[in-house]
């Protein structure tokens, strides 16, 4: 009886480890389609007072715009769009090439 219980435990452990390995490595290998992500919510970053100095977070989550610039994150992109006009459009998340 002990041998069959040990065999079942090994089989269960093997299945759990194989499943965990598959999930982990498939997430690493899978390409991320940034075009399917939603556009930045710029209204969230627009200052209420025009004299207000924007305080964007120091986070690297690059945004590429139609002006060819890569912004550090969506906050910097949205503030530039607010200051310089709607002709600056969102292209994709990630660096411009």
Curated annotation (Swiss-Prot):
Gene Ontology cellular component terms for the protein in this record: extracellular region
Keywords: Disulfide bond, Glycoprotein, Protease inhibitor, Secreted, Serine protease inhibitor, Signal
Site positions for Reactive bond: 58-59
Disulfide-bond pairs as recorded: 42-78, 56-75, 64-96
Molecular function as annotated in GO: serine-type endopeptidase inhibitor activity
Gene Ontology BP annotations: negative regulation of acrosome reaction
SUPFAM superfamilies, per the entry: Kazal-type serine protease inhibitors
Keyword Ion transport in record: no
Pfam family, one: Kazal_1
Glycosylation: residue positions: 33
Record InterPro entries: Kazal_dom, Kazal_dom_sf
Annotated compartments: Secreted
Residues covered by the Kazal-like domain: 36-97
Protein origin, superkingdom: Eukaryota
Presence of keyword Glycosyltransferase: no
Position of the signal peptide: 1-26
Coiled-coil regions, chain positions: none
Free-text function comment from the UniProt entry: May be a serine protease inhibitor. Essential for sperm maturation and fertility. Inhibits sperm acrosome reaction, protecting sperm from premature reaction.
PANTHER family (UniProt xref): SERINE PROTEASE INHIBITOR, SERINE PROTEASE INHIBITOR KAZAL-TYPE 13
Protein name as it appears in the record: Serine protease inhibitor Kazal-type 13
Species name: Mus musculus (Mouse)
Gene name linked to the record: Spink13
């Amino acid at each position: 009886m002990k041998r069959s219980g040990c065999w079942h435990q090994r089989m269960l452990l093997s299945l759990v480890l194989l499943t965990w390995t598959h999930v982990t490595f498939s997430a690493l290998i899978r390409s991320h389609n940034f075009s399917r992500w939603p556009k930045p919510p710029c209204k969230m970053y627009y200052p209420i007072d025009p004299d207000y100095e924007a305080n964007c977070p120091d986070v690297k989550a690059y945004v590429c715009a139609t002006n060819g610039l890569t912004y550090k994150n969506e906050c910097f992109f949205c503030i530039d769009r607010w200051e310089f006009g709607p002709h600056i459009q969102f292209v994709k998340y990630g660096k411009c090439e």
